[in-house]
Amino acid sequence: MKEKKKEIEKLLARPDLTPEQMKNYGMEYAKIEEIENITNRIKETQEFIELLREEGENELEIEKYEKELDQLYQELLFLLSPEASDKAIVEIRPGTGGEEAALFARDLFRMYTRYAERKGWNLEVAEIHETDLGGIREVVFFVKGKNAYGILKYESGVHRVQRVPVTESGGRIHTSTATVAVLPEIEEKDIEIRPEDLKIETFRASGHGGQYVNKTESAVRITHLPTGIVVSCQNERSQYQNKQTALRILRARLYQLQKEQKEREISQKRKSQIGTGERSEKIRTYNFPQNRVTDHRINYTSYRLQEILDGDLDEIISKLIEHDIENNLEEVLGIGASVEEK
């Protein structure tokens, strides 16, 4: 970080910089100073927490400063990440496990709903399809709030549950999965969709159990012909609203597709967000008999399963952010590029 700062100081001292370059490097310098400030506050808070533990302070006092530390990490992520968008689109689908996987998908949807409430974010359901037993075959929802995508992107992947299903009479523990995909919502101006590339179909919206809930064809299905991406929406009252919602989702999926294609061209080090839903690709396990949640990306374990499912996700996400920052600081920063020699 100090080397980056010195590099920009040298760049700012060059007499041949244009006003635009001067402005850009000035902004980068200010950003580094703010990052340094928050990094120092994180270090001080960590040291203070250790001191409280050594002195045997009560857990409530320690917990207060741990929550403050979680918030500092999220502020640091907001500064570091170029993808710290305030708008996210979240998609949840059952993986392996049949009806139990659909019930687990419902639990995850409830968890994110509660988390959004805790963060003061706005959550809007775009599309939801339920099973006869109350599980979810698919749910797509928008989340809007400070750094919503920058935080929720850590939830992308395969989530695994180990528990006795309500449908299991023998009391045996089953393993099921659900996939979560988190995409940044993309503005219309940021990605071009040509009308001639779209096939738009309308149909009657259906409710629980497949029964039709209205007599007009208000539901909309959009197919992007060049890529084969299909988006349908029937939650809104009018055909126009459903079409606009479907286009919002389509823009995000096209952006993600373009991003993944670009990343594959540059590097093979990243994989797709959610994989196939196979158990071996899990990012997190929720073990009910042991009251345990384990995030396999960082070997993090908590025995607060119910609290986490009730939306208390800040601690686990902050650990992921901390790991991300420590391992990818230079890549995440992406600043301090040198000026071309003339």
Curated annotation (Swiss-Prot):
GO terms for cellular component: cytoplasm. The keyword Ligase does not apply. The keyword Protein biosynthesis applies. SMART domains: PCRF. Residues 262-282 are annotated as: Disordered. It is found in: Cytoplasm. InterPro entries: PCRF, Pep_chain_release_fac_I, Pep_chain_release_fac_I_sf, Prokaryotic/Mito_RF, RF-1. Methylated by PrmC. Methylation increases the termination efficiency of RF1. Keywords: Cytoplasm, Methylation, Protein biosynthesis. GO terms for molecular function: translation release factor activity, codon specific. Pfam families: PCRF, RF-1. The modification N5-methylglutamine is found at Q211. Belongs to the prokaryotic/mitochondrial release factor family. Peptide chain release factor 1 directs the termination of translation in response to the peptide chain termination codons UAG and UAA. This is Peptide chain release factor 1. It comes from Thermotoga maritima (strain ATCC 43589 / DSM 3109 / JCM 10099 / NBRC 100826 / MSB8). The gene is prfA.
